[in-house]
């Protein structure tokens, strides 16, 4: 249920974002269809993973930032971004990539006359995030037992794992055992960095570039986000056993349900193609488009450098769909401009 609610909320935020950016009924209607099919029928919504639960918060950040008008200060939207991002970061830390993209977009468009206003927004964002995260941490400590920070895997572990050749930078059990074998956190970090350096040096410059390109393909080539590799372990039918429920369960759970996988793959390839058009016709004078572009660039760089899993990209689907719809909208505007120019010449 939580996965369905999270997905539905993400669909609403994504569609509203597309409308805010394009004001095109046709493009917005198409986004409704794509979001409903691609997100609503994606098998990852039945798995209790943070990749799904963080969807509404990350898509809310997308909507709040893209709905702000340049001529208005938009403090309410900034507060919404802070709350949504803080909750999202607690669920999935990679939400911070979207926040960094916002900061970079604001800096890129910074003018001297806006320094005080930007500083005020940054104070609201930073202070609000600290307060919200503090409240969340206090609530977590009150409900759950204190976690052992020394036993937690740090970024060095995922950096090391992301450079292994055996699984092409994805999850590697040997690396997990190697990290767990060292109890001292500082020595563990030193070992992880040393292993990473050794692996990179063995690849060489061109070998490293090729390796990271392979990881980029691994992250982006599957419209089911590697469901057959990671998610199909969740194969036991639970809950209701009515005829309708069983058909619905078999639709999502069954490993031999090729139809939905083919549909998802077709939509995903179409989205990727339209994102390419978004990049081709990208206007760097558009702050919101720059934010979307930097967010997508950021998550892909993250997956290239650290551990790569296709499902880590699932939470950024609202950004992909929005970019795809902008790519389609830009193409329409370009075609319209060419037609108008021809008519004017005639």
Task: Tell where the protein language model's regions lie, with residue ranges.
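Membrane-interface transmembrane helices that cradle and orient dolichyl/undecaprenyl
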Residues: 22, 59-77, 107, 112
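Membrane-interface anchor segments at the N-terminal boundary of transmembrane helices
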Residues: 2-3, 218-292, 296
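Membrane-proximal stem/loop segments at transmembrane-domain junctions that anchor or position
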Residues: 142-242
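Membrane-interface alpha helices of multi-pass inner-membrane proteins
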Residues: 77-92, 103, 125-129, 301
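Specific aromatic-rich, kink-prone transmembrane helix
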Residues: 13-16, 53-70, 83-85, 102, ...
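Transmembrane-helix signature of polytopic, membrane-embedded enzymes
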Residues: 11-37, 287-292
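Multi-pass, polyprenyl lipid-linked donor-dependent membrane glycosyltransferases
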Residues: 2-6, 30-60, 65, 91-98, ...
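Transmembrane-helix motifs of polytopic, lipid-linked glycan transferases
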Residues: 2-22, 60, 274-278
